[in-house]
């Protein structure tokens, strides 16, 4: 029975990864460099910063950082710059599900090529631990958030580090109750960020200390 359950869970994750690939790969590759190739519908750098610079808030000390789902690597290039403005040094690393996007990220950021890996967050084995790990709640199927956070805490994050989970929606999506979802999963946030935006759904991020 346990083996059957494990097989079902693996199949569930593999199907979710295939769904993610089918939804994102073509659009992200077509967008190429810049914010568009990292999932932003607005391609200006100002809009990109407004959407993502809040991720610097939980990075309150020097350290290494893994971006799960790094796409074309644009956040790997920009977030350390924003942190440096606050006097904090962040060494970026990336994990990307799609080999084509990981290859694009390595091409666009050759200085980071040896720090950008390809794999699924629920099966990939990290070569080291990181001070900070950022991930999205939709990188696993609904109901699997607890598994995602547990794996990131046990295998990805260094002692004293932080798992930072965000929930983003497009203009037609309904906001997800990220903070409640984390609490229900057994991981009440140690910190929360809720940014309201005119005529748009809020930006939500939360962190869990390791």
Kindly give the residue locations of the regions a language model identified.
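Conserved beta-strand signature within the Rossmann-like core of class I S-adenosyl-L-methionine
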Residues: 160-168
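Class I SAM-dependent methyltransferase Rossmann-like catalytic core
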Residues: 21-54
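Conserved SAM-binding strand-loop segment of SAM-dependent methyltransferases
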Residues: 111-121
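A short glycine-rich, Lys/Arg-flanked "PGG" loop and its adjoining helix->strand segment in the class I
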Residues: 146-159
């Amino acid at each position: 029975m346990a083996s059957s359950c494990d097989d079902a869970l693996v199949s569930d994750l593999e199907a979710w990864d295939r769904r993610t690939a089918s939804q994102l790969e073509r659009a992200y590759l077509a967008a190429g460099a810049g914010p568009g190739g990292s999932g932003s519908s607005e391609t200006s750098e100002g809009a990109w910063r407004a959407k993502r610079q809040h991720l610097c808030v939980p990075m309150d000390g020097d350290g290494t950082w893994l971006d799960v789902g790094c796409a074309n690597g644009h956040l790997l290039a920009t977030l350390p710059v924003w942190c440096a403005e606050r006097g904090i040094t962040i060494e970026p690393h990336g994990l990307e599900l799609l080999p084509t996007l990981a290859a694009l990220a390595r091409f666009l950021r050759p200085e980071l090529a040896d720090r950008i890996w390809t794999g699924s967050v629920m099966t990939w084995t990290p070569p080291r631990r990181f001070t900070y790990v950022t991930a999205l709640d939709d990188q696993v199927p609904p109901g699997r958030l607890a598994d995602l956070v547990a794996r990131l805490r046990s295998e990805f994050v260094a002692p004293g580090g932080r798992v930072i989970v965000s929930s983003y929606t497009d203009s037609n999506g309904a906001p997800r109750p990220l903070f409640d979802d984390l609490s229900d999963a057994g991981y009440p946030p140690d910190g929360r960020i809720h940014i309201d935006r005119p005529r748009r759904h809020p930006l939500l991020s939360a962190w869990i200390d390791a």
